């Protein structure tokens, strides 16, 4: 199945709770596009850095993300949201969903792959969110902090 045949997933009203929703791209087996980091899997934050220094208490510590990929498409399921995007540099195919912090504020985010880095640029905000591989680990740079994540298993596994 191709990415074009799989409907775009959206965060349910109010966000999802409890068990992770079923994977979105499970039936898609197209190879990743050139320049895409392989982020597929279920990941857990094990370290948070602020200004290069480890922070021992942070809301992101221990959090879990499921990342699915197929061709230029990425879904990130975490914290009650499902962000489904094509990494083609357009608003139309980027994340058009709700923010994680309240599960109701609409967001539009342009997604790209740039030299093996997944880059998210929220429309109207001067920030970038990045994900890239560092050996076996995944790095996630958000506003004000950077996280190291370890892979718990394939994207098909049910976290928890």
Where does each model-flagged region fall?
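Short, basic/low-complexity N-terminal boundary segments at the transition from targeting/disordered tails
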Residues: 39-54, 86-94, 99, 107-118
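Surface loops and adjacent helix of pleckstrin homology
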Residues: 48, 79-81, 88, 123-124, ...
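Acidic, glycine-rich flexible loop segments
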Residues: 105-129, 133
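A structural detector for short beta-strand units
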Residues: 63-65, 81-83, 107-109, 126-130, ...
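Amphipathic/hydrophobic helical signal segments and adjacent flexible N-terminal regions
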Residues: 1-73, 154-160
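Short, exposed beta-strand-loop hairpins at the edges of beta-sheets
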Residues: 137-144
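N-terminal glycine/threonine-rich, aromatic-flanked beta-hairpin/loop signature
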Residues: 5, 54-104, 143
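Beta-strand-connecting loop/turn residues
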Residues: 70-74, 116-118, 136-137
